[in-house]
Swiss-Prot record:
This is Protein NrdI. Pfam families: Flavodoxin_NdrI. Belongs to the NrdI family. One of its GO terms (biological process) is protein modification process. Coiled coil: none annotated. InterPro entries: Flavoprotein-like_sf, RNR_Ib_NrdI_bac, RNR_NrdI. One of its GO terms (molecular function) is FMN binding. Keywords: Plasmid. Probably involved in ribonucleotide reductase function.
Amino acid sequence: MLRLVYDSLTGNVRHFAETLAAELHVSPMRVQDPAPTDAYLLLTYTFGSGEVPASTRRLLTTHGHLLRGVVASGSYHWGHNFARAADVIAAEYRVPVVAKLNKGGTAADRAAVRRWLLHYAESAPPFPTSCTGEPTPWNAG
């Protein structure tokens, strides 16, 4: 199972991440916690008129290579900028947008993210592989 790493300003993403984590029997991490050392799903918010929060950027700058998907919250009233942080991060790090949440999200949103996580867990390679194709102790060739 991917680690859940979240960034929250108003508490909406925190509540979504903690509720999802409880349903999955895992412990979520905040972006302010010690950085993840394994693959993770990022749950974040959209700042201003569509920006990625600075705290999320700091995590991605050093640990973006471990990112496997992104969930972002926003508000429908922002129109085309709704949860735009998800689109920006997905494009920059070439990962899927798993979900866009209106404010705190819904039970249906949690179910969709949970399904994606379970599918990812079933289809992910069983051992680490190098992003560059170089042999590692697990895929010596």
